[in-house]
């Protein structure tokens, strides 16, 4: 896989594409990724790797399902643990596309992050990290991709986020 890895490292440099490492476990993994130009560590498997990534100015990406499930399905570090340590920057949907809103809600409900902090993990921070400067915030001149959310109170006392409306580039699509 080394020739393929080098191809993607070179391609991302040539074309100005943000590069992420994957499943960093050790300091050496993070240092190699940083040397290759990675600006993100996707799914660091240990607190050690996540800390090292931050020391190199890299953003840590974790999966929404990890937050919702309460931990990694493969026994790696929990996203909530990284959030508590100030090491969680971006949430990705990973293998459950609908997990982002639930993950944001979990982080807030557990008192790990404020609403603005949790929402930034799925909006402005990933947009900036990937060079998508036309989105990620509610500001004049940006795309205006928005969702309207209702927080439903369930009979068991839990709360659940329900999407009520969606706007894409300022036009309501749902």
Where are these regions (language model features)?
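Glycine-centered positions in the ABC transporter ATPase nucleotide-binding domain
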Residues: 166-170
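Active-site-proximal flexible loops/turns
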Residues: 29, 101, 152, 157
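His/Asp/Glu-enriched, well-ordered alpha-helical/loop segment
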Residues: 56-66, 70-151
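Short glycine-/small-residue-rich flexible loop motifs, especially phosphate/cofactor-binding loops
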Residues: 9, 30, 50, 104-105, ...
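Conserved acidic residues
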Residues: 39-40, 89, 145, 164
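Short, small/polar residue-rich loop motifs at catalytic or cofactor-binding pockets
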Residues: 159-161
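Histidine/acidic residue-rich metal-binding segments in metalloenzymes
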Residues: 1-60, 72-87
């Amino acid at each position: 896989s080394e020739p393929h890895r080098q191809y993607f490292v070179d391609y991302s440099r040539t074309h100005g594409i943000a590069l992420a490492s994957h499943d960093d476990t050790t300091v050496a993994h993070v240092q190699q990724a940083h040397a290759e130009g990675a600006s993100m560590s996707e799914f660091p498997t240990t607190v050690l790797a996540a800390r090292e990534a931050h020391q190199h100015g890299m953003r840590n990406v974790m999966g929404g399902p990890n937050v919702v499930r309460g931990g990694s399905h493969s026994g790696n570090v929990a996203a909530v643990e990284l959030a508590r340590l100030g090491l969680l920057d971006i949430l990705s949907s990973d293998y459950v596309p609908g997990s982002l809103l639930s993950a944001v809600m979990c982080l807030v409900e557990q008192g790990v992050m404020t609403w603005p902090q949790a929402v930034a993990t799925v909006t402005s921070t990933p947009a900036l990290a990937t060079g998508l400067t036309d989105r990620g915030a509610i500001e004049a001149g940006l795309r205006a991709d928005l969702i309207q959310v209702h927080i439903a109170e369930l009979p068991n006392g839990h709360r659940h986020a329900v999407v009520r409306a969606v706007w894409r580039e300022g036009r309501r699509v749902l």
